[in-house]
């Protein structure tokens, strides 16, 4: 909801799709591939970036990304790691797949 409000207040036209799914590598990969094939501009995912056995989001995204953008997530880890040390354990990733920007947020 926050993302939708932010973009609508900036006067941009956006279409936001929310999907809640289990920690399933094949299901996540299929969804991301479908969105990339549709030339979606930006994909944000939340969760699944930690070091637990079910945290698979960065691993799936790495298979799809053509170019990684490491600085974005490094900045987020440093900024929030000072206040929330567990943020430093995040394996968040950002990159480009075709024409689509992908961000795996904690």
Describe each region flagged by the PLM.
Residues 1-106:
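Non-catalytic beta/alpha edge segments that cap or flank active sites
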């Amino acid at each position: 909801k926050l993302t939708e409000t932010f973009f609508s207040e900036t006067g941009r036209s956006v279409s936001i799709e929310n999907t809640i799914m289990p920690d399933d590598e094949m299901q996540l990969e299929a969804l991301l591939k479908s969105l990339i094939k549709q030339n979606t501009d930006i994909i944000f995912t939340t969760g699944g970036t930690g070091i637990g056995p079910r945290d698979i989001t960065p691993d799936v995204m790495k298979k799809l990304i053509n170019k990684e953008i490491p600085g974005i997530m490094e900045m987020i880890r440093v900024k929030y790691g000072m206040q929330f040390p567990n943020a430093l354990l995040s394996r968040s990733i950002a990159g480009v797949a075709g024409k689509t920007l992908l961000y795996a947020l904690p």
